[in-house]
Amino acid sequence: MALLPIAPWRGAVANRHTPMDADAVTRALERSGIRSIAQLSIREIKKLIDTIEGETGQRYIRMEMGIPGLPPSQIAVNAQIEALKRGVAAVYPDIQGIAPLKREISRFVKNFLDVTVDPEHCLPTVGSMMGAMACFLTINRMYANREGTLFIDPGFPVQKLQCRVLGHDFMTFDVYDHRGPKLRDKLLSYLDTGRVSSILYSNPNNPAWICLTEAELEIIARLADEYGAVVIEDLAYFGMDFRRDYSRPGVAPFQPSVARHTDNFVLLISSSKVFSYAGERIGMLVVSDALWNRRAPDLTRYYPSDLLGYAMVFGAIYALSSGTSHSAQYALAAVLKAVNDGDLNYVEGVREYGEKAHIMKRMFTDNGFRIVYDTDLDAPIADGFYFTFAYPGLSGEELLRELLYYGVSAIALGTTGSERTEGLRACTSLIQRSEFPVLGERLAWFHRDHGKPAGPAA
């Protein structure tokens, strides 16, 4: 199926001089069979850009995927090498994780969230995506008469894909206009249906980079307790609200978390961003002690036990992957121990993302773009791993498609559950500072081609 024709107001791209080979971009789009580029997933955008780069030899400014742009923790690398030398590659790891890692995850949660969780209830997973899948497979099956997850959006698009693959229904709303006390009424409008099994959000938020406050988290916690919904808190960007220092173990301030307001929670913690360990696919799934021991008879429709923790480990996780990479567990245990002992400041190593975001946002706004999610309650949005942008007069689909011809990639906000469908998400991680001049040139070129001409002089 060919792409829809270019809108007349744009003119024929092939007749314009653009930074990328326009004919090659158009051919790649037409061959792909894509009808709506705004609906493409992160990986589909990546594949499209890889194809164009491979055919043209021209490089894009890559902002579509949150690939860490920093080297991995050397502590983790060394520990993994040593584990491999000891021969762990020949041994299946326990599904529930190795003891040293479970201890360090528990310590990390205590040190940086001020929350106590039994090490037995701290599990390694093959990335946080597997942790989310395990949650959907168990938590959303605790009650046969419930529908599924309520997503407090915008959010990570793949989590909804996981629900679709499982055949689960879900609900969603864009939280941006429902911050503060207004959040309660919005949540009630969904919880009152009696169909919500779980509530999921990311904090800091991917893609808007807003950060829910303790007061908002308390609202979520109280309503979740009242309605019996489990809160799944995605902490993929743990401690990365750089406006505050969350880096000191056991010392306030602590990373904001619903876990301090309820015992009805699951935490998804990633090693990909904070420790730049994305390639080894290892994350952390932390289940509260109370939830771990909760009985839900409807679980026995799928699992041998009605205990949530047992069903999660020996039902869902076992079926997904019989354990997480043995050597990677030793890597994560080592870096967590260094952080817990105060020997490694985990935040200092990733501040570069915030610094780059500050520069990049200025480059966009200097060239006619605007930041879509630009405030966090009554404060300017923080600089971090992501930011959102739009261009006057263009829809998100039009902007995403046009930017392909200017060598800039991103994803459409519409795929994240955002109501701001005119916008795109930019990730700051993969672009290097040495590429900033190229980004500036391409944005200026885009603005020259798309900016409205000045009106006649008065």
Residue ranges and their predicted role:
Residues 6-15, 107, 111, 115-117, ...:
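PLP-dependent enzyme catalytic core of the Aspartate aminotransferase-like
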Residues 18-25, 31-130, 181-182, 336-343, ...:
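N-terminal small-domain helix-loop-helix segment of the aminotransferase-like
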Residues 69, 272, 377-379, 415-418:
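AMP-binding (ANL) adenylation modules
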Residues 85-227, 232, 238-262, 266, ...:
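Conserved core of the PLP fold type I
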Residues 261-351:
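Conserved core segment of the aminotransferase class I/II
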Residues 286, 388-390, 427-429:
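Short hydrophobic/aromatic beta-strand micro-patches
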Residues 326-329, 333, 346-361, 371-390:
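Conserved glycine-rich beta-strand-loop-beta hairpin in the small C-terminal domain of fold type I
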